[in-house]
Regions:
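Conserved, mostly hydrophobic/aromatic
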Residues: 186
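Catalytic alpha/beta active-site cores
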Residues: 1-178, 193-196, 200-204
């Protein structure tokens, strides 16, 4: 109900709406609240337009539509929580399983316009890392998620497009090339090591 009140007046399934949630440890719970709110908005619209409750098949169609259309990002980067913020609510293994559960849900329900994780170097830099260390740890975290999701049987070309990245910036000269270097390393690894398709080569930040 709180999430519904928060987004009252916003069409969460509009192409012009994208919601970014900077939440990590509680990400699965908050994301579930958000996605259910988007679904409920579609059901409420159906009631208003048709003057009745949707049937089970209609409700399923509305649910599938909302999940396929809704846009946004949930940070949910548990590894940088441990490395840069020391705020890991759960064990690393358990947190990785929860992140995998989120991505598995996205795959199963064709959630293609929502980033399931924003792999974040910014916080690592704020904790004292120089640009090179920030980049190295952030990419390592990204590859860790790739390996974890592959181990669960997910297709790399289905889940990697749900990844985004987040880096800091500054006056150090390395920052002038960090984005290009990150994209190069990611693309080469996706192509040469993982055999992924061209869409997975794109590091988005």
């Amino acid at each position: 109900d709180d999430m519904k009140a928060l987004y009252a007046g916003f069409d969460l399934c509009s192409p012009q709406t994208s919601v970014s949630m900077t939440i990590n440890g509680p990400a699965p719970t908050v994301l579930a609240f958000f996605l259910n709110t988007a679904i409920d908005q579609q059901i409420d619209r159906f009631r208003e337009e048709n003057g009745r409750e949707p049937e089970a098949s209609e409700r399923a169609t509305l649910r599938a539509y909302a999940l396929e259309i809704v846009r946004g990002t949930v940070q949910a980067d548990i590894l940088k929580e441990d490395q840069g913020q020391n705020t890991c609510l759960f064990s690393t293994d358990f947190s990785l399983r929860m992140m995998g559960d989120i991505q598995q849900y996205f795959v199963a329900h064709n959630v293609r316009n929502f980033y399931s994780v924003s792999i974040s170097g910014y916080h690592i830099a704020e904790a004292g890392a120089n640009p090179i260390t920030q980049l190295a740890l952030t990419l390592a975290n990204g590859f860790t998620y790739v390996e974890a999701y592959l181990a669960r049987g997910m297709d790399i070309d289905v889940f990697v497009p749900n990844f985004s990245f987040f880096f800091s910036n500054g006056m150090d000269p390395e920052y002038t090339v960090m984005g290009r270097v990150a994209r190069r390393i990611w693309a080469v690894a996706m192509r040469e090591f993982y055999g992924a398709g061209s869409r997975s080569h794109k590091l988005k930040y």
